[in-house]
């Protein structure tokens, strides 16, 4: 994969003063040292703090349980992998030959780890305030699609309940493609609504995860129209 430096205008939203931090954040353990595992450790804590702070401020009446469930939904592996794809991290990862051959640049776990490592790299490059300003927009669509009191429900369930409450047709989930070896499958699914008209596509290491991602994006579309 190409390990080109992010420039202004890239989806990440930050130009690195220290490009070595970016290079390390994008280097998987399979490619040798220095790899991104220590940055991943630091980034995990920063992501949890940023998301927890955002939820605390946006949901002033939510109890601890609702906040905890919401944070878990937003920082889970699949959700972070969606962000990684949005940032085009897969094409920029440095992977060892084995991971390259097995499609590691598409794997949710590797993409999620890379997102956490990038967050840590931004923090070390420019400090917490700038890190918050860059990273929180990555979560905006997911935050908007996660109503208070329904954080324990998955996106497909929330979408179905939203449609049923309005006596509208249920969504259709269509498999667009299935690729990869048995141990590294990648599913591409579309979520299609007849009324109101909406469509979004999701990807994941299982059909269920791909459908959940697509449903999340459809919910974000519906919220933006209100």
UniProtKB/Swiss-Prot annotation:
UniProt keyword Zinc present: no
Keyword rRNA processing: yes
Chain positions recorded as Mg(2+) binding sites: 40, 113, 116
Any one GO MF annotation of this record: metal ion binding
InterPro entries: dsRBD_dom (IPR014720), RNase_III (IPR011907), RNase_III_dom (IPR000999), RNase_III_sf (IPR036389)
Single GO cellular component term: cytoplasm
Catalytic residues (UniProt): 44, 116
Main location, first listed in the record: cytoplasm
Compartments (UniProt record): Cytoplasm
GO biological process, one term: regulation of gene expression
Domain RNase III: 5-127
Domain of life, per lineage: Bacteria
Enzyme class: hydrolase
Required co-factors: Mg(2+)
Function noted in UniProt: Digests double-stranded RNA. Involved in the processing of primary rRNA transcript to yield the immediate precursors to the large and small rRNAs (23S and 16S). Processes some mRNAs, and tRNAs when they are encoded in the rRNA operon. Processes pre-crRNA and tracrRNA of type II CRISPR loci if present in the organism.
HAMAP family in alphabetical order: RNase_III
Protein's name according to its UniProt entry: Ribonuclease 3
């Amino acid at each position: 994969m190409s390990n080109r430096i992010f420039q202004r205008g890239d989806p990440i939203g930050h130009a690195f003063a220290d490009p070595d931090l970016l290079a390390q954040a994008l280097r998987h353990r399979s490619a040798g040292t220095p790899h991104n595992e220590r940055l991943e450790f630091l980034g995990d804590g920063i992501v949890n703090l940023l998301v927890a702070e955002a939820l605390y401020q946006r949901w002033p009446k939510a109890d601890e349980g609702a906040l905890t469930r919401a944070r878990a939904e937003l920082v889970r592996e699949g959700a972070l992998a969606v962000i990684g794809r949005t940032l085009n991290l897969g094409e920029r990862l440095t992977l060892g030959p084995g991971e390259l051959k097995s499609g590691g640049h598409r794997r949710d776990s590797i993409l999620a780890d890379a997102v956490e490592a990038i967050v840590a790299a931004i923090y070390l490059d420019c400090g917490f305030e700038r890190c918050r300003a860059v990273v929180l927009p990555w979560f905006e669509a997911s935050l908007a699609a996660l109503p208070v009191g329904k954080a324990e429900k998955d996106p497909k369930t929330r979408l179905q309940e939203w449609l049923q409450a309005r006596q509208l047709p249920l969504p259709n989930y269509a498999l667009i493609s299935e690729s990869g070896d048995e141990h590294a499958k990648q599913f591409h699914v579309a979520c299609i609504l007849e009324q109101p008209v909406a469509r979004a596509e999701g990807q994941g290491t299982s059909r269920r995860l791909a459908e959940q991602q697509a449903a999340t994006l459809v919910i974000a579309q519906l919220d933006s129209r209100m």
